[in-house]
Amino acid sequence: QMCIRDRYDNMGKTMMDIGKTLFPGLSQEECRKVMEECMTYENHYLLSHPGVLYPETREIMACLSRQYGLYIVSNCQSGYIEVLLESCGLREYVRDIECYGNTGLPKGDNIRMVVQRNHLERCFYVGDTHMDEEAAGAAGIPFVHAAYGFGRAERPVGTIESLSQLT
């Protein structure tokens, strides 16, 4: 049985780390198989059941993308970001993406990879967990805490209470 607190406690973790938490009695191989099935189902489900976006997300991303490059780095599985962007009508606003499911690398390395691949000279990472803050630090870029999200930050360079504060 899983409760809301379990979901919040697992936000930002890789799918395999979530699997270890949810299924501690399974072997690593059994856990991998279960999580692969969950990830496939989740990606398929998301195509026809897009998530609920924060207020004005589409308008804010459209506005920001006219002046700045928008990039997404996540600890999610392969395909999740693409499906999410497509199902929510946001694909046109994002220039590049990377995730743990594609590379098997920690988020900090994936952030660094996106920065290098896109020749970014000035950037910052917006996230809502301490793990996001640590990943931005590992990549050597400033971290802005999205306080409306799931977690806390210790020393962000800035804090936003809503997505609209980025415009």
Give the ranges of each region predicted by the language model:
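Short, acidic loop-to-helix structural element flanking the phosphoryl-transfer center
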Residues: R32, H44-I72, S78, E82, ...
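A metal-dependent, Asp-based hydrolase signature
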Residues: D9-Y45, C63
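A short acidic, helix-capping loop that chelates divalent metal ions and anchors anionic groups
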Residues: I18, E42-L46, Y80, G151-E154
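Short, small-residue-biased leader/transition segments that mark boundaries at the very start
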Residues: M2-I4
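Asp-based, Mg2+/Mn2+-dependent phosphohydrolase catalytic module
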Residues: E29, S78, E82-T167
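Alpha-helical elements of Rossmann-like donor-binding domains used by nucleotide-donor carbohydrate transfer enzymes
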Residues: D17-T21, E37, E59, C63, ...
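Short beta->alpha linker loops
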Residues: N10, V52-E56, C76-Q77, N102, ...
